[in-house]
A protein has these predicted regions:
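Metallo-beta-lactamase
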Residues: 1-25, 41-53, 113-145
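Conserved beta-strand segments of alpha/beta enzyme cores
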Residues: 23, 107, 132-134
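N-terminal Rossmann-fold NAD(P) dinucleotide-binding loop
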Residues: 92
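Short beta-strand scaffold segments in enzyme catalytic cores
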Residues: 35-40, 142
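Pre-active-site segment of Zn-dependent metallo-hydrolases
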Residues: 32-35, 44-85, 97-106, 110-114, ...
Length: 145
């Protein structure tokens, strides 16, 4: 099935049920190591999954880190409900402090170790007061409003 068929099938399903569809918009982390960041969009709500960075390649002189393009997210901040962190590797949490310098993240959910690591990074960057961190346990259900 090609992309046009998928879009057509999604549009038909949406028209039949009159309910929104889930849109998944990767901002980084595809065909590369690093920048793992993904937007999940459902109706009027947006959730960000991870906020990673990548390290520069050898030819990128003077560059310390490489960040995903968050233009789409920044254009839709009024719909942004929060972030879910999957784990504490740099390619999944390393960009969050940088993001917090540019825009507000209402709440960040994640496992205890990742949240502890993230809290330290945020304090070091001076952005710890710009969001709320919520630790979640395995199989815990969280409703993001």
């Amino acid at each position: 099935m090609n992309t046009n068929q998928i879009k057509s099938n999604n549009q038909q399903a949406q028209r039949k049920t009159n309910s929104p569809c889930l849109k998944i918009v990767p901002l980084g982390g595809l065909h590369e190591i690093g920048k793992n960041t993904c937007v999940f969009e459902y109706g009027d709500d947006i959730i960000l999954i991870d906020g990673g960075l990548a390290f520069p390649s050898d030819g990128m002189h003077g560059v310390n880190v490489v960040m995903p393009d968050t233009t789409y997210l920044q254009a839709n901040l009024h719909r942004f409900r929060g972030m879910i962190v999957t784990h504490g590797h740099e390619d999944h949490i390393g960009g969050i402090s940088h993001h917090l310098k540019k825009f507000r993240i209402p709440v960040i959910y994640g496992p205890p170790l990742a949240m502890s690591m993230l809290r330290g990074k945020m304090e070091e960057a001076g952005v710890a007061d710009r969001t709320t961190i919520q630790t979640i346990e395995p199989r815990q259900v969280v409703k993001i409003k």
